[in-house]
Structures are given as structure tokens and as C-alpha cells.
Amino acid sequence: MEPLHAGAAGSSRAVCSQGPPTQISSSRVIVHVDLDCFYAQVEMISNPELKDRPLGVQQKYLVVTCNYEARKLGVRKLMNVRDAKEKCPQLVLVNGEDLSRYREMSYKVTELLEEFSPAVERLGFDENFVDLTEMVEKRLQQLPSEEVPSVTVFGHVYNNQSVNLHNIMHRRLVVGSQIAAEMREAMYNQLGLTGCAGVAPNKLLAKLVSGVFKPNQQTVLLPESCQHLIHSLNHIKEIPGIGYKTAKRLEVLGINSVHDLQTFPIKTLEKELGIAIAQRIQQLSFGEDKSPVTPSGPPQSFSEEDTFKKCSSEVEAKAKIEELLSSLLTRVCQDGRKPHTVRLVIRRYSDKHCNRESRQCPIPSHVIQKLGTGNHDSMPPLIDILMKLFRNMVNVKMPFHLTLMSVCFCNLKALSSAKKGPMDCYLTSLSTPAYTDKRAFKVKDTHTEDSHKEKEANWDCLPSRRIESTGTGESPLDATCFPKEKDTSDLPLQALPEGVDQEVFKQLPADIQEEILYGKSRENLKGKGSLSCPLHASRGVLSFFSTKQMQASRLSPRDTALPSKRVSAASPCEPGTSGLSPGSTSHPSCGKDCSYYIDSQLKDEQTSQGPTESQGCQFSSTNPAVSGFHSFPNLQTEQLFSTHRTVDSHKQTATASHQGLESHQGLESRELDSAEEKLPFPPDIDPQVFYELPEEVQKELMAEWERAGAARPSAHR
């Protein structure tokens, strides 16, 4: 690999001619930057002695990439180590299973490219899209008209097409080629990296043309040559944006080539694939791609993946999980944000291409608090959770054969929003989904890169010991639709009953909000013991509600209390409850082994709904044939497994919960009612809110009031 040189940027100049204007197909200028044998380059920078020697980067039994010296001697990417050694006995192998240095260098490249344009979209460790449209326009505006004829293109022009400088699109792309050369030169001078670049009117074409001349070269695609480039593809699966599953469905329809897809009746295609997908892929077949370059931002998830020939025991599985988890915890500590959801993915031995399964669940709040502290105190409870997820997918009493395991942290939140006490279940916001992005998460079989976006159509992927993804999206053509949370922002707040504070109301679960606004189903319920399983808590929420109550009192003296019948009862699977079935009287504590929660949930759900339904309710799962992740909203961190139900189901469950508890807790309710009449309350405390607090918190507050000599007015319901 030769370094870039100033001026020529290590590439040839194309001859420019002036002629009549041609049709403009697009005003955008997009550059796709693809680093040459990225892992090998990082190793050669780390150890310059390897620069002129055949070098391969090994992960497990594969050479995942190699430098061009090795390629000259017959070594290829993804070659078996034994075969590579036979081809090239002098091959130097470096272990590339630790991706830390590759990840660090990858982000340095992205940061450097952002100095040219803020619109930089990561596509794995070694690829980036850059939208240069605005920068190109500024340069053209600053270019004197008399200098336009002397503008030269840097690098190759695809298909040796002549450049017409009277064509504004040609001029834009020529200036884009100059900026692309500057970016490549900066990468070499500042980071020591070389790479290829493709300059085109959209992302699809830039991606395709960047690989025409390699290594360390760049190519410009003019609009008139787009069809030539598209038709040079041997199969539709080579079109970026058409994934494996979509290609298989198209093959069933007899569509194999680009020409087949271009000429296939759109109505038939829409009937088979749906309108959106059909129109999208047919546009791609013509080289049309309107998708924007989306700045990636911080990763939305972290995952570590390990592939192996065979894992057939629970002990082996636990060891793999511990290894993956240890690496993830280090990354969480470095990132500074805290994950609120953990996912386990497995792959069984099979000849199928997509046969992965996954389960995920929220991370308990007391475990979240330990994350990112620099120690591994959170390891034991997380391992317990992951092993429960594992046993939910794999019957360990029967023989099994796994070839892949992955652990993923997602639903990452900034530290400020993560610092919540154990009472945050009362104030859980329903606006934050388990996925912070609409794009789907798909773990690819041959992908070693930590990216804000996974490569959309199996583009130039690498296999690995580990796959580290940052959480977002396969091709939109193959994306799985996920259930969305209810949007509570549209509820008519002006219709709130008197005495209900809007700020407090907004933080209640959606079901309770709707019931307060539209339903009176709880008015006939008696007693305060509506929480089937009270939660251990701090005093934080009491102060919050007390403040809101005093504010409401000042604004409206007649609104002195929030009636308990409106807010006190909650369905078993809403925030503020344990998530156990109505008949359960267990009282788990956050300090206990997390497996207790999962065991209780499994038993209760299996008893009430049967094995099949309970599995769907306990975990966000994937069908092996589809390999998509279905995520339910993370309603609270104390509740590990949320049950996905409709609003009507919530109301029915809440009523059944009260009726089921009434016979078992009659004595307890009578004792509470009797004790309530004697309890002392300071004037700024709402009794109804007080009775919804955990019992030990009630006792602590009562003792404090007695010590402080608080007034003792009789509590009124």
C-alpha cells in the first residue's frame, strides 16, 4: 500500500471535456470511505516490522482479514488458518479477538471525517458515508467562473466517462472527488491509514463504486454511468440494501438478476413483498437511493459474541457468558452510560442461515446502580439473570448443541437519568422504549464490527470470535416491526378530575391514566391493599408527592387529596407492582438473588396461562426462523419480565387481582383500615399516597413523626 501524496492524492487525473449540458439526476454528493484491510493496518501501525511481511489477523480458526502482501501469495479473507498456512508458510498470524484497538482507531477515523462534514454515518469499523453536498456548494460558490474549465477530477472516473464541466452535477462530483482525496490524505498523514473512496450522487452508488479500484484509490461515478454499474452486478444479492432473506424471496419469484428486478411487474412484487419493500428494492435496482446520511451519534447498544464449534453443557455456557459479560462491563465503564436491558442470543447447530433465538429482560435497579463503577460487583446477579434466560431457551436436561452465544446491553441511558433510587418504579416514564431507535437489531453471523449501524445487506462482512454491535438496524427491507408503546402525550389532560396534579398524572402508567380519565372501574373497590406485592423503597417519592400536594393545595384549597380509588390500584404488570400474578403474596426484596424474581414469574405465568403463552409474556423472544428481536417496553427496573397486554386486559386483570386478594387478605385489610384511623399524619402528607408506600417505609416515617412531635390529626379517607 502506497501512501497518498499531496496534490495528486496518489491517484490519476481524468481528462475533462466541455460539451452540452446533460440531465441532472441528483444534487447530492456522497462519499463512501472504505479502509483497506483495516484490522491488518492497525496491527502494522502497532508493529511496523510487520508492514512488508504477509500478515493475517486470526480469530478462532479463521483468517478474518490479511494485508495485500499476503493476498499476493494466495491468502484470502475468511480462509481457514490451516489452508492459509499451506498457501503461505511464511504468513505471520496475529490474534485479533480483542477488538479494543480496532474500535478505538475506528472512532478516530470517524472523528477525523467529521472535521470535513458533520454528516458522517458509520457503517461498521472500517466504513463511513460522508455527505459533502454543502461543502461542495460552498467551494463552487467561491470558485471564480474563469477557473471552472481548469477544474480537475482526482482519481478514476468509472467507465472512463468524459467529464462535462458545463454539467452542474459533473462539477459537483469533481469537487467532491477533490474533497475525498483530501480526506484520504488526512487519514494517512494523521492516522497512518489508507483507504478507498467512492464519489456518487447517493449512498447506494457510492458504496458500489468505491470498490471498483482497490487498494488506496478512489473512483467517481457520473450519473450517465449509473446503469452500467448496476448491471455489472452478477446477482441481486450484491445490491446493498437487499439482504439474504429478501433475495431468497425474490429468487422464488424468478428474480435473479438486476434486469429481472427492473422489469418485474411492480403490482405483483407489491403483492408478494408489500408496497413499501417492493417499491424500495425496485428503486435500488435502478440505482435510486434517497436515504440520507444520518450522523450515527453514540452507540445504542453494546454486544459481545462468541462463535465456537460446540457448546453442549450448562457449565460451558456459563463460562462463555462470564467471558462475554466481563468484556461488556469494561465497555460500559468506559462509555459512562448505563444499560437498562440485557439480551442473550444463542444459535443452535443447524444448516439454516438464520436460526438464532434471543431472550431479554430489564436489569433490576439495584444492579444498574453497580454498573460502571469500575468493579464487577454486578457480575453475579447478571450471570444469574442470563442463565435464567438461557434455561428458558435451552432444555438443559436434554442434549443440545450450540455454536454461538451473544450478550447484549441495550436501552442505554445517560448517567443523570440512570441515577434513580428504588422508588423510580412509581415514577417510570413510559416514553422510553426498550429500543431507543426505530431500526431493528440484527446480529450478523459474520460481523466483527462495533457500529452505530450494521452493514445493511451483508456488505463485506467478517466472521469473528466475537461480534460487537452497537445496536441498530439491518436493511429496512428485512427489518422486523416491533410493538410500540402507547403514547400518553395525546391524553386529554384538561379532562383530569379535580385534585389530580398534572405532573403527577403524567408519570403514572398509561393504563392508570386512561382509567382515571375514562373509567370508574375502581370506584367500587374497597380497602387500600391494592398492590399485590409491595416494593421496598426509599423516601424519595414521598417527598415528591408531598411537594406536589402542597403546590396543588395552594392553587386550589378544595383539592386536598388525590382519591385512592383513582390511583391506588394497579394491575399486576404495571409499574409499582411486582409483576407477580394476582394470587401471589410473595414479597421479594431487591437484595435477594435475581433468580427469585424469574422463578416466581415463571411459575405464576405457567400456572395461569400455560407454557406457550407464558414464554411469550416473560421474555422478549425471537422466532428462530425470523431471527428478529421483539422488545417490550421497560416499564420498571424492579420488574424483570413485563407481560404484554392490552388496556382492556389490564383493567380486567386489575379487577381480578383485587377480587382474588380479597378472600386471602380480608383480615389484613381490616387491620389496615383499623390502624388507619389511629395513624398520625402531618398536615402536608396525603394519607392516600402514604398507604401506597411499602410497609417498612410507613413504619419509618411514623417513627420519625413521633420523634419530631408532629401533630396527630385523624386521617380521613
UniProtKB/Swiss-Prot annotation:
InterPro entries named in the record: DNA/RNA_pol_sf, DNA_pol_Y-fam_lit_finger_sf, DNA_pol_Y-fam_little_finger, HUWE1/Rev1_UBM, IMS_HHH_1, Rev_trsase/Diguanyl_cyclase, UmuC
Compositionally biased spans, kind Basic and acidic residues: 665-679
Disordered, as annotated region: 1-22, 549-589, 603-622, 644-687
Expression (tissue specificity): Detected in testis, and at very low levels in spleen, lung and brain. Detected in round spermatids, but not in prophase spermatocytes.
The reaction(s) this protein catalyses: DNA(n) + a 2'-deoxyribonucleoside 5'-triphosphate = DNA(n+1) + diphosphate
Comment on protein domains: The catalytic core consists of fingers, palm and thumb subdomains, but the fingers and thumb subdomains are much smaller than in high-fidelity polymerases; residues from five sequence motifs of the Y-family cluster around an active site cleft that can accommodate DNA and nucleotide substrates with relaxed geometric constraints, with consequently higher rates of misincorporation and low processivity. Ubiquitin-binding motif 1 and ubiquitin-binding motif 2 regulate POLI protein monoubiquitination and localization to nuclear foci after UV-induced DNA damage.
Enzyme class name: transferase
Substitution effect: E574D: In strain: BALB/c
Top-level taxon: Eukaryota
Official protein name in the record: DNA polymerase iota
Outcome of mutating T643I: In strain: BALB/c
Positions that bind a 2'-deoxyribonucleoside 5'-triphosphate: Y39, R71
Subcellular location: Nucleus
Active site: E127
Region of interest (DNA-binding), ranges: 300-307, 343-360
Organism: Mus musculus
Gene Ontology molecular-function annotations: damaged DNA binding; DNA-directed DNA polymerase activity; metal ion binding
UniProt motif Ubiquitin-binding 2 (UBM2): location: 685-702
